[in-house]
């Protein structure tokens, strides 16, 4: 049953294929198949803006976008994220134009053999401790992104990116500042490529759940901002996407199952809904039986070999870090249940999450907006 519920993303119609279309348009050899509908539009576009709104996947838009909204009247294509559908894997897949198997960016936290610890990939901080190894993830799995590759192939062309305030490079204090900064950058350009990333509605959905009025307001505010940006820049092709969607979750606290914890070398890594487990020597058979008895109704369990042979992390050459960081087994949520290793009463649990194997988390809308040729 869990096998049937696992949604495998389409590796010919995904975020990676989108970024390869963009590479192709700007004379960079693509690494993977492109998307024909995007290729056809890009052919007539000298100014291209790729905007990613974190967590604004298909299920979120279907639930919250007002009927009379700007985006509801814009042309769109359904595409998939990657697996796992989570920010670390998906945004890096988009920016690298390669699948997670190729980039090594598989999830929020990964095991690093040389430090024998699990680190958060964006910060380098220990996931289950206080030590910080800043720069180590980038050192292991750094890559040249599509902005840099396009600039190399088109040295005279304007290429840039815009971010929330956490970024030292073009960090923007709020949504209005983000939108106006991009509009200002477009003002006098004849040819350009701009990437913009915004971190909502993801944060709001994590904290408040998919049915929250705050999430609805966020998505409709983004919609109004996009209408302003696109109408002020009619000669620009705007490609609007998300990295994933979210679902409300229920938690399974693993350290409440000592017979299961005793089989593990260390806490799980990657993601609570796509968990990587390292197993103690000789405990393989016992682990599989115990896992399936306790959690098999809610999770699909794959061995490392099965996960790789089935190409759940996408097509292409395996990054060396993947072999090191993947545990013996991968457990993929196929419903609302989510792992938590340990729970303290003072912990604030996220209401909604992503990175699992459901269609809701994976499917996206890609909007293609241009008012003039």
Feature-to-residue mapping (PLM):
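Feature captures the catalytic ectodomains and active-site-proximal regions of enzymes
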Residues: 1-373
């Amino acid at each position: 049953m869990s096998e049937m519920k696992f949604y495998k993303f389409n590796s010919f119609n995904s975020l990676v294929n989108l970024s390869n279309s963009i590479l192709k348009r700007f004379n960079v050899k693509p690494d993977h198949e492109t998307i024909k509908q995007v290729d056809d539009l890009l052919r007539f576009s000298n100014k291209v803006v790729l905007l990613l709104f974190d967590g604004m996947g298909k299920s979120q838009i279907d639930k919250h976008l007002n009927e009379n909204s700007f985006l509801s009247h814009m042309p769109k294509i359904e595409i998939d994220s990657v697996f796992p559908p989570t920010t670390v894997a998906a945004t890096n897949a988009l920016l690298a134009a390669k699948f997670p198997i190729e980039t090594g960016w598989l999830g929020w936290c990964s095991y690093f053999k040389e430090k024998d610890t699990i680190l958060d990939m964006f910060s380098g901080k220990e996931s289950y401790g206080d030590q910080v190894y800043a720069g180590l993830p980038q050192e292991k799995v750094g890559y040249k992104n599509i902005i840099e590759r396009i600039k190399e192939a088109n040295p005279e062309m304007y290429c840039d990116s815009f971010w929330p305030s956490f970024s030292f490079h073009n960090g923007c204090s709020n949504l209005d500042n983000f939108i106006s900064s991009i509009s200002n950058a477009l003002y006098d350009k004849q040819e350009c490529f701009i990437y913009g990333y915004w971190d909502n509605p993801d944060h709001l959905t994590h904290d408040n759940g998919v049915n929250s009025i705050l999430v609805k307001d966020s998505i409709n505010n983004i919609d109004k901002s996009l209408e302003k940006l696109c109408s002020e820049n009619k000669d620009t092709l705007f490609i609007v996407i998300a990295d994933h969607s979210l679902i409300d979750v229920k938690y399974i606290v693993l350290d409440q199952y000592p017979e299961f914890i005793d089989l593990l070398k260390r806490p799980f890594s990657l993601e609570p809904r796509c968990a990587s487990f390292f197993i103690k020597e000789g405990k393989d058979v016992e682990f599989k039986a115990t896992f399936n008895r306790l959690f098999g109704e809610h999770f699909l369990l794959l061995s490392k070999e099965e996960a790789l042979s089935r190409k759940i992390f996408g097509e292409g050459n395996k990054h060396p870090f993947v072999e090191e960081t993947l545990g013996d087994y991968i457990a993929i949520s196929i419903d609302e249940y989510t792992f938590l290793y340990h729970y303290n009463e003072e912990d604030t649990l996220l209401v909604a999450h992503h990175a699992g194997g459901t269609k809701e988390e994976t499917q996206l809308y890609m909007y293609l907006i241009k008012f003039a040729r």
